Amino acid sequence: MLKRQTEGSVICPACGVLVGVNDETCYNCGRRNPGLWGYAAALRRLGNDLGFVPLVMGGTITLYALSLLLSRGSIHGMLSPDSRVLLALGASGAFPVFEMGRWWTVLTAGWLHGSFLHVLFNVMLIRQLAPAVADLYGAGRMAIIYTIAGVTGFALSSAAGLYFPNIPIIPGAVFSVGASANIFGLLGALFHYGRRTGNSHAREAGLQYAIFLGLFGLIPGTGVDNWAHAGGFAGGLAASMLLDPLTRERTDHMIGALICLSLTVVALVASFVTALPYLIQ
């Protein structure tokens, strides 16, 4: 429970020193509102990611289960939901974005998955990478990077699906789901952190993961959306450059993260509501 604290001391989320819960600024680092309106201690108990990782993992698994439930008798091999159900819930790609005008699916597609192995693999990567990025950038900036990477990844994928649908090996996606664009954004953030700070471990980890997963996507028959991967990495890299990891996380980063999550929820609701006539048939 997020119980509000009205008196006493809390740990500044930016620099870690003890400050008053009602202090306007941290005396040590200058961060404004270090008590986060009395919720700093409660949020700290959620971990460095402030509960974002469990939220993404839980939401992703829940939506996968919902897609299987709505598929009813149309579940395919490897526990793959019906593509029409995924389309209704917010799949992205050239067809949903340009033919159907469902532009908001660049926010929602990263929460949907096409098979049990697909969701399992991506959830495991999120569990491994997102806390690491949160440790380096802070929870707010990590959530912003994750969201922006999904948007840029699926935007590029959809555009490539419209203009380059038949390129050998790396065709654009007419239809696409999965958190891999967001995951590549986290890799881009790790790479930038390593380059910005001189941390060779972070730089090499981000780059090597991206290269390995990128090469895997070039294997014929895997159905991997390489354009989403490239767009996600570029988006995560660009966002992390703007959200300089050498600066302390600020309150406006947390506000930005809440806006990103709110827009994603609105997009998911919009997808579901606009698809409701189909789903109740």
Feature map (PLM): residue ranges:
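A broadly conserved sequence feature marking short terminus-proximal activation segments
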Residues: 1-5
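A detector for small-residue-rich transmembrane helices and their helix-helix packing motifs
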Residues: 8-21, 27-281
